[in-house]
Amino acid sequence: MSLLNSSLHELDPDVAAAVDAELHRQQSTLEMIASENFAPVAVMEAQGSVLTNKYAEGYPGRRYYGGCEHVDVVEQIAIDRIKALFGAEAANVQPHSGAQANAAAMFALLKPGDTIMGLNLAHGGHLTHGMKINFSGKLYNVVPYHVDESGVVDMEEVERLAKESQPKLIVAGWSAYPRQLDFAAFRRIADEVGAYLMVDMAHFAGLVAAGLHPNPVPHAHVVTTTTHKTLGGPRGGVILSTQELAKKINSAVFPGQQGGPLEHVIAAKAVSFKIAAGEEFKERQQRTLDGARILAERLVQPDVTEVGVSVLSGGTDVHLVLVDLRNSELDGQQAEDRLHELGITVNRNAIPNDPRPPMVTSGLRIGTPALATRGFGAEDFTEVAEIIAAALKPSYDADDLKARVVALAEKFPLYPGLK
């Protein structure tokens, strides 16, 4: 049989077995990592299409390769759809990831050595917002801002630091922060010091698309996002900007940072943007929010707090909950491992003023997007919250909790058509 036409199982049973095992893991467990979601079958079909074969350096109508007439159509559809979804003047759908979207935006707006401001990593920021070991911390002078004692971004500190440091760019966005940001206040501060405002909405873009979270696009010069997480599409990135900055942004992506775009992924992005414009998507995002609030409310009850578990900022406005374990018998790694043994996948996460090392941490980040995509409603999220609350206590019935996790997974079959 020709290798060109062999199936994965026929050609490479070792890789096929690992893929099959991962499918089973996703089907049989509860995915609660806040940055993860389940891509629709149509999205995966587009990503696995023949578009993976096509090189297309450049942009629609201006390519450096022949034979791009069909990928031009696909990419323009993606551009038009995401501009409409968020009300943006311009969009670049080529970044391979959110990190590359952030890098390209910074390359377009900054010079090495310029000053930037971003949320401190331990306070909820992202690597690309100025961490020293990241390109953003190596190329630019970074002035981090922080959350206050209540766990909310300290806008007075942001304003003070901006006036003192006169940054060229202020980054508003986060990777582990449970509250909404005041984009209008960030823009006012940016304007006062002559800085660009870049919003990284990778985590909450789906909520914005559904009208359940303030839209940063009217306030920011540039907005970056991933296309997975709450958007629920393929893994990739996007940059939205004003028309005035579009040429700089496009040049920073190609040829500045990337060569050929991944047109099969761009096709998958286009499909996911169509889904995100629909009513079913909006209803799912509401269940995502409701689920996170149900979880947060359960974890602040006395039977949980008395064993040293607390919720940062006291609750959530978004799709995730940050759990503080500093006063618990468990550290972040132990809590993650315990939930994993029960069939619930979360991730340990640093919290503000965390006394433990990064690979251990004193916190958990727990998200609801994947379960909402799977179909979970309020009753189901209440059951999940009860399971997690029980598991974080010193004494718990592992067998009972495992059985309850299995029952929830079986109630909402995932990808039943995939074998």
UniProtKB/Swiss-Prot annotation:
Description of how the protein assembles with itself and partners: Homodimer.
Name the record gives this protein: Serine hydroxymethyltransferase
GO MF term (any one): glycine hydroxymethyltransferase activity
Organism from which the protein derives: Streptomyces griseus subsp. griseus (strain JCM 4626 / CBS 651.72 / NBRC 13350 / KCC S-0626 / ISP 5235)
Pathway: One-carbon metabolism; tetrahydrofolate interconversion; Amino-acid biosynthesis; glycine biosynthesis; glycine from L-serine: step 1/1
Catalytic activity line of the entry: (6R)-5,10-methylene-5,6,7,8-tetrahydrofolate + glycine + H2O = (6S)-5,6,7,8-tetrahydrofolate + L-serine
GO cellular component, one term: cytosol
Annotated positions of the N6-(pyridoxal phosphate)lysine modification: K229
Top-level EC class: transferase
Pfam families given in the database record: SHMT
Swiss-Prot/TrEMBL keywords: Amino-acid biosynthesis, Cytoplasm, One-carbon metabolism, Pyridoxal phosphate, Transferase
Residues of the signal peptide: none
Family matches, as PROSITE patterns: SHMT (PS00096)
PANTHER family in the record: SERINE HYDROXYMETHYLTRANSFERASE, SERINE HYDROXYMETHYLTRANSFERASE 1
Upper lineage: Bacteria, Bacillati, Actinomycetota, Actinomycetes, Kitasatosporales
Main location: cytoplasm
Compartmental location: Cytoplasm
